[in-house]
Amino acid sequence: MILFTADWHIKLGQKNVPIPWACSRYKLFFQQVQDAIDKHDVSLHIIGGDLFDRVPSMDELTLYFDFVKDVSVDTIIFDGNHEATKKNHTFFTNLKRVTEELNPKVKVITETFYLHDWAILPYADLHRKGSIEDIDDVDYLFTHVRGEIPPHVTPEVDLERFDKFKIVFAGDLHAHENTQRNIVYPGSPMTTSFHRNVVKTGYLLIDDDWSWTWHEFDLPQLLRKTVTSTEEMVQTEWHHTIYEVEGDVSDLSGVKNSDLLDKKVIKRKTEATLILDKEMTMEEELGEYLSYILELDEDKVKKIIGVFSDNSRKANME
């Protein structure tokens, strides 16, 4: 049984994501990977690229090596586009020796690799001329390639080039639902951006006959909610939730910054056009703006104009 995961995107210090929460989630993920290996009698774990989100920091490397040292089953890691340093090069080349010396069960693959009736095409080789066509005598391929998500996301290579394989197991697209043609994506096990609702994340189990099934992880996620009051901004224990506070300018002026606040959103009911008469006073122009553009109620408009008038008189007296 082969376990296939991809797109871990180990990253610390992301905006609005507390580092302790992120570290805790990665460690929980590592444990769930081990649980899946034990439960399903997995003999090989393949990690299909974008294990890192970028060239890793020291703290991100610490998480990586914590995972590597505890690996108990044969594991193959190959690179994705986020590990690329330039075309046809990956920083995994620099991690290969230390990774394999730390735990001989873990192999880092940075060049096209063959085993029995399957092969691995790392991202560093994907864009070499003839890289796909030159892979012969295998029916199954592991790689990292962007597929299509209409209408905006287009494939990075002609996907018909993969038609020679019975199944291609690939990293890159973050949702299993983006599986297409003969290309199967496990999706990212962890949400890497904030979502409005909880999404399903998981992994692939590949049997000896190359049939596969998709299974879910149960991990905390990054969520964004829209509220109209700071009283609705409740800190959540499992998921990490941030909030957009929606209201008019007057309401939002009293909202203080906090770790739970993502942004303030001015809510407007109409797309009004401001029409000003040349005979209007500044107070009248301000009243029109507050009423028809910012859509404040009459009491708030009167209060703001009163403050403006008082300050104007003081300025004229100085």
Provide a role label for each language-model segment.
Residues 151-213:
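Conserved beta-sheet core of the metallophosphoesterase superfamily
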Residues 75, 105-107, 117-119, 137-141, ...:
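Active-site regions of enzymes building and remodeling cell-envelope glycoconjugates
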Residues 1-63, 131-137:
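N-terminal active-site segment of His-dependent metallophosphoesterases
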Residues 76, 83-161, 189:
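Conserved catalytic scaffold of divalent metal-dependent phosphoesterases
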